[in-house]
């Protein structure tokens, strides 16, 4: 049966056009119930002994997804009209529901009500899309009641007052979420129920246990219509709110409209905005702008603490100068100029896009009565210091006080000091290493689940070996006669020979984006049979590779470059240590060692040439742990040693990436995936320039290796070549006009994309259609499009899974750092120690030090917390020195000091490494 659906739309040119689509209706769509006597039950997903089948409306799924994911909620019919609405309203919830529908252990069945002849409904004249969809849900529920008869109760779950009223009038069984959960006899499930706030929503009779004193704390958010108009007129400024990681009462909003960061001080001015929210900001009067002064943790922050949340812990900032509050006396010839240097300050007037998600932390009991029904109120304290405390109610407080739990945010009323949320699940005991490691993964959105059977089915059977078909492939060169060897990390395997576009394996890799390296484990982007048994380069084993081959002069000048898929047979698989030992042993003169020395000589010349062009050595200190094989606890900690062998491999990998970038850009100028590192601004480099001047260095900021410390905010990112002009392709840190990622397809999905682009440029394979769509490729590369805009209207977007390359890359880095921090805490909890440290940044109440022995950077206080020094300590900006007012004691940048390292817990369940001056 054919129906025509028509609607009008506005074109890019501003014209209105009518679109007519054919809509096919069928009568052979099955209900999914095993007990059905009419439908084919071979593909039934629901339980055969279910007494009740649930039908959920869209808003229930949107607001109660944490509850729905609980195994107690099962035998659910998911209507296609609900899926369509979810896809347009919230991509994250849509994907979570789809995962439930595809899970073999959950009883969720998708019913295509929009294509069933008896359940499809046309919109009536004057009926809103929302009302039409609610009616479609009720019609489908009624159909199920008639279709299955009295053997099974069909229950519509809705919190919409009007939808429930109409359902009851139409003879449909309907309940609210809370009443249904109560009927299950599992009181702990009620902790998962999100309490709706709208007057159009049905609420059970629950006493409001919030404090009766309803004082207005925050300003009302402006409506979107007013925000849009204000942005257009330049009254408001849009940007992402970034809360200071070490002082949660200070935030920044990067504004393109004024070309600067707007500073937001205090929770009142943040106006219920969370870190990562897209907000509209109004500038404060200029006489209220923040004055640039010496850096401190005191005074202004202390005022916020006393006024808003006195038990909040505030830290001296160990990273960027822009991450610390400023308040201290300043000396030197630039003092007056510093006092007059004001930066834009503002307040949040509206939330354009929320960044709420689930948070890990623990409970802090509130001094309130238990209330009715065993309900207790508590404040949830996130491990992420940027997140405000969250008010929840729970029926299992006694069991949760010593646990790490997950809580989701539901709302934040302007009358409440804290946002309201609900308990999601328990992770484990506080302080347990496995629990805290899982927290690291959850906080950074790292997917660590096992690979599914569908993904593993994409792999070739083991044992795998190079076949005669591979050797006879005209697009693959036989290089087995060439003396090939690898130095860890391995050379460029031909991963894309096994990871084909559009397969479950490719979808999974694109969602993971990158492998994640923790202290005690590695979370792979691709399954281990592929990375360890099929693609990894081993001695005397034939492998498929994607090769970049240069002809070079003895001076490391490239005469020619070619690219080919190949078959290789490695004569040796060396670690960095083994390769270095060979090069250093003068007794060895075998061909392999000679090759290593020759390559190292070329690499040194290549490296020097990059440095001469202005390249920077940006690698920060890497901490290495010795881990107990049984307990997995750290036994020792130190800095990872970089050898010439490491630098040799790095040079050739960089050269390969540059060569591939040039090749793919030449063939695909509008859709190549490249990587750039923008030039840092003068403001970013200012702290480094001050430090250099204090020790008598005339710093050339275009080429010094010392820039690493000042480039915290100049981040390398992926981009699509069609979105920027060639001068913007520059990778500043490498001093390379073009750069991409090609050499690590086993652990980075970006490299998989580049492999496909390179293969297409060589006419080995066709370019996948996704790469021919520039807007779509941009959405893949740019995390902000994916993460902060669920309504992505991108051609064929639903044909692939979004990759979030920059987002996944950054999260993997943050997870690695958090894992190092966790194991550092575990180690020093048992091994407090004294050691040497070097001062690297000056603050008005202390300084930041670097501990060479352990590769640790952290704050050392000269004043007690909450004490602004009272003028006792002053900062000399010119000489980068902090000293007592009477001049009796002073500390200078780059000075060595002796410190004590130990773990303390100033707040419950928030251990930190404390550095104390000896």
Q: How would you name each of these model-derived features?
A:
Residues 62-64, 69-72, 83-88, 94, ...:
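Eukaryotic short linear interaction motifs
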Residues 199-496, 502-541, 873, 879-892, ...:
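Charge-lined substrate channels and their catalytic hotspots, especially those that engage the 3′ end
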Residues 54-55, 77, 155-157, 173, ...:
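Beta-strand cores of modular interaction/reader domains in eukaryotic scaffold and signaling proteins
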Residues 50-58, 72-74, 152-155, 159, ...:
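Core residues of folded domains in eukaryotic genome-function proteins
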Residues 66-69, 89-91, 168-171, 179, ...:
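Short coil/turn segments at secondary-structure boundaries
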Residues 1-217:
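Noncatalytic, typically N-terminal accessory segments of nucleic acid-processing enzymes
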Residues 57-64, 79-81, 157-159, 177, ...:
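Structured beta-strand/turn binding interfaces of compact recognition modules in eukaryotic regulators
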Residues 384-386, 411-414, 429, 433, ...:
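Electropositive polyanion-binding surfaces
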